[in-house]
């Protein structure tokens, strides 16, 4: 390991990580109201003497309360961009969003998704800047807003900031995910025929048909060729009315997370096949669907030369290089459309994100900070990757 890199990694401060992570989690920052988190992170950078800029991301006309937080080390153009998102989903339960600690584990809304990753990026920046080592090649680190909703922070960032290699700090337990699932969000609509509730056979029940349609879709998704390539999640369903009648209307939202090998057309065929079967069984109910959002997945070659600095950083940080797939939708889908090689890699477990017991392990956040610091040193130093693909 190079002397400068070793010195920087040794300076990663566990106490500083813990303090900032707790403060960040305690700063409630749902999408479109992220200013508290931006203030916490910008204050940490300012205290450490790390220069930054704010990029406005207006939600409505005249809104000046939202902004991406951007740091650049070294000259332009950038050879590396690291990205975290400061927003969380909204609080949905009475337990509160605040941080609580149990030994090495920090619980709280956004702990894994992804304030742990943001804190690791901040700590890496502080360690590198305090070491006083000049960057020969440009490094960008951005903390964006809006990821949990529209991705408007990332959309604004890519207008002016780009690099051949982009690292997204979403929770992967530090597995380098060079492949990323696609995402399709679909609304299902069923319109039936109203009748008295005591004689349901005289009508067409929109709720019954909807349930049958959704179960058919789920059942088909668990059959070849889809197992392990497709995750189906019925997210919302509502319909009927308070009166003593057969339900005339029902709507549902259903999510499809699909491997890069599954196309939008494959999902469309799955929906239509289920539609045909259910329509035959429920002739008095009309079924239709609308695709609301499609974000294609991607898979990058593990031999791409642009991965060189990341591979070396894993070695420097003492971590195993075993690439995997990221199974969720994220801002990575947006960045990948620009031609950058996008890799998802951060502390935390995706399975606990958005849950009541969301948490992240402090030692993993510390490992992430070491990895990011090593990557900044590798990419910003003498050995720089070409733009070859």
Task: List the predicted regions and their residue ranges.
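Acidic/histidine-rich catalytic neighborhood of metal-dependent amide-processing enzymes
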Residues: 114-185, 387
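Acidic/His- and Gly-rich active-site-bordering loop/insert found
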Residues: 2-107, 130, 135, 332, ...
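Acidic-glycine-rich active-site phosphate/pyrophosphate-binding loop
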Residues: 87-102, 178-189, 312, 343
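Short glycine/proline-enriched loop/turn "hinge" motifs that connect secondary-structure elements
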Residues: 90, 133, 177-182, 243-248, ...
């Amino acid at each position: 390991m190079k002397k400068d890199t070793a010195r920087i990694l040794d300076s990663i401060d566990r106490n500083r990580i813990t303090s900032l992570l707790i403060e960040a989690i305690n700063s409630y920052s749902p999408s479109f109201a992220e200013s508290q988190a931006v203030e916490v992170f910008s204050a940490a950078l300012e205290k450490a003497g790390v220069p930054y800029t704010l990029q406005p991301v207006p939600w409505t006309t005249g809104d000046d309360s939202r902004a991406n937080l951007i740091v650049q080390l070294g000259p332009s153009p950038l050879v590396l961009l690291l990205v975290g998102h400061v927003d969380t989903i909204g609080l949905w339960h009475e337990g509160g969003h605040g941080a609580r600690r149990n030994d090495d584990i920090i619980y709280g809304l956004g702990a894994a998704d992804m304030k742990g990753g943001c804190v690791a990026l901040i700590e890496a920046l502080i360690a590198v800047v305090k070491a006083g080592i000049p960057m020969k090649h440009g490094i960008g680190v951005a903390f964006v807003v809006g990821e949990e909703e529209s991705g408007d922070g990332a959309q604004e960032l890519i207008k002016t900031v780009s690099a051949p290699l982009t690292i997204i700090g979403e929770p992967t337990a530090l597995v380098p995910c060079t492949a990323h699932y696609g995402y399709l969000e679909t609304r299902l609509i069923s319109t039936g025929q109203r009748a008295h509730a005591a004689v349901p056979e005289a009508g067409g029940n929109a709720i019954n048909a909807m349930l049958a349609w959704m179960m058919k879709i789920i059942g088909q998704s668990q059959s070849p060729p889809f197992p392990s390539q497709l995750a189906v999640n019925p997210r919302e369903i509502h319909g009927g009315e308070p009166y003593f009648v057969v339900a005339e209307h029902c709507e549902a939202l259903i999510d499809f997370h699909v491997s890069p090998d599954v196309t939008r057309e494959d999902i469309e065929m799955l929906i239509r096949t289920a539609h045909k079967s259910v329509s035959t069984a429920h002739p008095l109910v009309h079924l239709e669907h609308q695709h609301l959002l499609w974000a294609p997945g991607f898979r990058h070659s593990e031999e791409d030369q642009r991965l060189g600095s990341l591979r070396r950083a894993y070695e420097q940080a003492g971590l195993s290089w075993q690439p995997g797939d990221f199974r969720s939708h994220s801002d990575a889908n947006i960045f990948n459309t620009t031609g950058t090689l996008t890799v998802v890699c951060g502390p935390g477990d995706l399975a606990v994100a958005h849950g009541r017991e969301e948490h992240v392990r402090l030692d993993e956040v510390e490992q992430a900070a070491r990895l990011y610091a090593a990557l900044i040193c590798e990419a910003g130093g003498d050995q720089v990757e070409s733009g070859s693909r």
